[in-house]
Each structure stands twice: as structure tokens, then as C-alpha cells.
Regions:
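ABC family nucleotide-binding domain
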Residues: 10-211, 216-217
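Short, Lys/Arg-enriched N-terminal segments with co-localized hydrophobic residues
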Residues: 2-7
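Conserved beta-strand-loop-alpha-helix hinge in the C-terminal portion
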Residues: 221-239
């Protein structure tokens, strides 16, 4: 079966987005189309200002497109009621950001359980804590954790609700090299173990080597979009 004949979990169709400041107009996205499959790891790369984060925010409902459509399971998001759209974002999307945004007065376990409350199909918290390598830290508060442990907790909060799509915006940007490698290995494990589609925005060109699909943006347009035929494990990445 050809790629174009396959059914897609999410379709991004001719998305355009502009930002206006006075008389200045910046075209952030220009006719961007992209299809995502179940369990696909997609790396979106490009320089600052290329439109990477804008695209991620539109997929996640943080921002809206001026033109174009998002289609999930055959239904246009623009046609969904506000209630259904809110449920879609809350239950089917998970977010991992560069900064961890943990709730400071909740323990590691409680931060993750917040995500579980949002789902009707949550993962087992104990199993997830073991997968994340933070079971022994589950009673600690965020300020008692290292940066890597905080990011592991943030990943746990995002993944515990078992989202269809996990959106990652520079998830290792605030971490050192060794910790970054550990977090990328963890995200790879999450993708393989739980089958989520992962969309990762990054400046780190090396991450393309661990992705199933590589999308390169420049000036708001997709310049390259290809399947990675020589995928390597995160543990073998170097930069």
C-alpha cells in the first residue's frame, strides 16, 4: 500500500498563520500540510522563526490557524463543538515543554496523578513511575529533584493519561548533554511501549536520526518531509 493510501490518525491540511504588529505582517506558516500515523515519531526541525512551535501550538489547540484544517479520525476540529474540542485536547493530547511546569506543592506521584484524572484510560501510575526511573523519588517535591528528574516527572504527567499524540517542544533544551540523552532514551521507550504518536520540535539536528519521519521547516514552509530509512536508537545519538 502506498503511503498516501494509508489512513492517518491526524491530518494537517494547508495550514496558514500570520501575526500582525502594527503594519508589519509575519507569515509564520504558509500552506503547511502533514499526515501523522499512529505510533509515529515525527521530528520537526528548523531554525528559530521557522514556524516549528507555531505548528505544534496549532496541533495542540494553544493557537489557531488563519486558514486550513486539522482532521482527527476523519473529523475536522473546526466542526467540533467547544465541549468536544476541549475533551479532545484534554484526553487525547499530552504536552512536554522545555520548562517542566510542575505543581510545586505536589509530590512527584501527585503531579503525575493530576494527568491521570484527565483520562478515562489512564496508565498504571506505579508501572509508569518504574518506567520513568523515578519510583524511589515519588514522595519528593519538585524542588528536591534534579533537572532530569523534574523532566521525567513532566513526561509522566503528560503520558499517564495515555494520549494519542504527545507534543514535545524542545524537551531537552534546558538539560545538559548526558541528561538530554537519558530523556531522549526515555521518550523513545514511551513511544515503543505505549504506542503514542510523538511530535517533537527541536533545534537539535541529531534527533532526526531517531525519528520515523523528519520534517524540516524554513520561513513557515515545509522544505523537506521524508521517512527515515536509517533510524538509530537514541542511545547512539551524538552531537
Amino acid at each position: 500500500m502506498e503511503e498516501g493510501e494509508k489512513e492517518y490518525m491526524l491530518q494537517i491540511q494547508h495550514i496558514c498563520k500570520e501575526y500582525r504588529t502594527g503594519n508589519l505582517v509575519q507569515k509564520a506558516l504558509d500552506d503547511v500540510s502533514l499526515n501523522l500515523r499512529d505510533n509515529e515519531f515525527v521530528a520537526i526541525l528548523g531554525p528559530s522563526g521557522s514556524g516549528k512551535t507555531t505548528l505544534l501550538n496549532i496541533i495542540g489547540g494553544i493557537d489557531s490557524a488563519d486558514e486550513g484544517n486539522l482532521v482527527i479520525d476523519g473529523e475536522r476540529l473546526a466542526d467540533m463543538s467547544e465541549k468536544k474540542l476541549s475533551l479532545y485536547r484534554r484526553k487525547h493530547l499530552g504536552y512536554i515543554f522545555q520548562m517542566y511546569n510542575l505543581i510545586p506543592n505536589l509530590t512527584v506521584r501527585e503531579n503525575i496523578e493530576v494527568g491521570a484524572y484527565l483520562s478515562d484510560k489512564p496508565l498504571d501510575v506505579d508501572e509508569l513511575l518504574h518506567t520513568l526511573g523515578i519510583y524511589e523519588h515519588q514522595r519528593k517535591l519538585p524542588n528536591q529533584l534534579s533537572g532530569g528528574q523534574q523532566q521525567r516527572t513532566a513526561i509522566g504527567r503528560a503520558i499517564v493519561k495515555n494520549p494519542d499524540i504527545l507534543l514535545c517542544d524542545e524537551p531537552t533544551g534546558a538539560l545538559d548533554y548526558n541528561t538530554s540523552k537519558e530523556i531522549l532514551k526515555l521518550i523513545e521507550t514511551v513511544n515503543q511501549k505505549y504506542g503514542n504518536t510523538i511530535v517533537m520540535v527541536t533545534h537539535n539536528d541529531a534527533i532526526k536520526d531517531m525519528a520515523d519521519r523528519v520534517v524540516k521547516l524554513r520561513d513557515g514552509m515545509i522544505r523537506k518531509n521524508y521517512l527515515n530509512e536509517h533510524k538509530i536508537p537514541a542511545a547512539e545519538l551524538d552531537w
